[in-house]
């Protein structure tokens, strides 16, 4: 399935998913430092593996995906399949509505 097939995302639900599944390793706060994973502020429209000051794996640098709804939807299903060799240990979100909700939150929170 694709992002176009997903139900409309709910940013409030996405915020809860981010807090439960992502916030241990990522922040969305402008100007905040990186954690275990890169700061996701400004991620939409950015090329993967390019957040200044974060030490990416070679696989993350080589992928060069431009982050938007479609690429994030595919990536969040199975990060290790989307970018083999990524350092991200997250297994992924299997439910389309969870991915759509998280993307809606990220789009609002990282702009």
From Swiss-Prot:
InterPro entries: Cyt_c-like_dom (IPR009056), Cyt_c-like_dom_sf (IPR036909), Cyt_c_1A/1B (IPR002327). Heme c binds at residues 22, 25-26, 88. The modification N6,N6,N6-trimethyllysine is found at residue 80. Its main location: mitochondrion. It is found in: Mitochondrion intermembrane space. GO terms for molecular function: electron transfer activity; heme binding; metal ion binding. It holds the Pfam family Cytochrom_C. One of its GO terms (cellular component) is mitochondrial intermembrane space. Keywords: Acetylation, Electron transport, Heme, Iron, Metal-binding, Methylation, Mitochondrion, Respiratory chain, Transport. Binds 1 heme c group covalently per subunit. The modification N-acetylserine is found at residue 1. Electron carrier protein. The oxidized form of the cytochrome c heme group can accept an electron from the heme group of the cytochrome c1 subunit of cytochrome reductase. Cytochrome c then transfers this electron to the cytochrome oxidase complex, the final protein carrier in the mitochondrial electron-transport chain. Belongs to the cytochrome c family. This is Cytochrome c.
């Amino acid at each position: 399935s694709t992002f176009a097939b997903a139900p409309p995302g709910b940013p409030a639900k996405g915020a809860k998913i981010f807090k439960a599944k992502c916030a241990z390793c990522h922040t969305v706060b402008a100007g905040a430092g990186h954690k275990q994973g890169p700061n996701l502020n400004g991620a939409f429209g950015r090329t993967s593996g390019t957040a200044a000051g974060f030490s990416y794996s070679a696989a993350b640098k080589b992928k060069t995906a431009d982050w938007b709804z479609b690429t994030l939807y595919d990536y969040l299903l199975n990060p290790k399949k989307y970018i083999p060799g990524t350092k991200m240990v997250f297994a992924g979100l299997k439910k389309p509505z969870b991915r759509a909700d998280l993307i809606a939150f990220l789009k609002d929170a990282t702009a």
